[in-house]
């Protein structure tokens, strides 16, 4: 009838674009460092007439991306109202970013999973692994607790190696 609730089985969520890096393949929507770069130096100069020229000009209004950096985010608030019911139907939950380990919502999500185990859920996080030690330690403690509690079917960490050395 169209009135039924529909819940996803796969959910990818980004709580924030706060990030400590500006990877070459990333964009301001997913990296606050790219927002800072574009505000300081303007859009990247691209070859005129290419499809990418129009893409770069789309970043003229960088303030529209700042809601993701605010302490109070209406989208995150809405997520937490919706998630407890949707969670029951999930098979895969993946947190992306920004850098997810820099968002308090990531640890809050992990706490939720510990409190409400789902043995059918695959839980994944994308991370650059370059966060301060305090955040890293908190994350590892939560991961170990999740593993020991067997509160999810599978834990996966996705990362990339953008560069190495100095």
Task: State the predicted function of each range.
Residues 8-18, 29-74, 87-105, 116-166:
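Core AdoMet radical
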Residues 74-82:
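Conserved RecA-like ASCE ATPase "motif II neighborhood" in helicase/translocase motors
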Residues 85-86, 112:
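A short, Lys/Arg-enriched amphipathic alpha-helix followed by its capping loop at the start of a domain
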Residues 109-115:
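Conserved Walker B catalytic segment
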Residues 80, 110, 140-144:
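Generic structural signal for well-ordered alpha-helices
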Residues 21-25:
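C-type cytochrome heme c attachment motif
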Residues 4-5, 82:
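Donor nucleotide-activated moiety binding/catalytic core segment of transferases
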């Amino acid at each position: 009838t169209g009135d039924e609730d529909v819940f996803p089985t796969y959910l990818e969520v980004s709580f924030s674009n706060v990030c400590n890096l500006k990877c070459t393949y990333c964009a301001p929507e997913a990296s606050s460092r790219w927002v800072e770069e574009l505000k300081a130096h303007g859009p990247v100069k691209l070859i005129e007439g290419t499809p990418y020229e129009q893409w770069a000009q789309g970043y003229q209004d960088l303030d529209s991306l700042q809601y993701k950096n605010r302490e109070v985010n209406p989208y995150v608030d809405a997520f937490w109202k919706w998630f407890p019911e949707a969670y029951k139907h999930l098979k895969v939950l993946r947190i992306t970013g920004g850098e997810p380990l820099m968002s308090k919502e990531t640890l809050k999500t992990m706490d939720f999973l510990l409190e409400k185990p789902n043995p059918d859920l695959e839980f994944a996080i994308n991370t650059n692994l370059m966060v301060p030690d305090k955040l890293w330690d908190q994350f590892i403690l939560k991961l170990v607790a999740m593993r020991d509690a067997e509160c999810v079917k599978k834990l996966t960490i996705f990362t990339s190696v953008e560069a190495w050395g100095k």
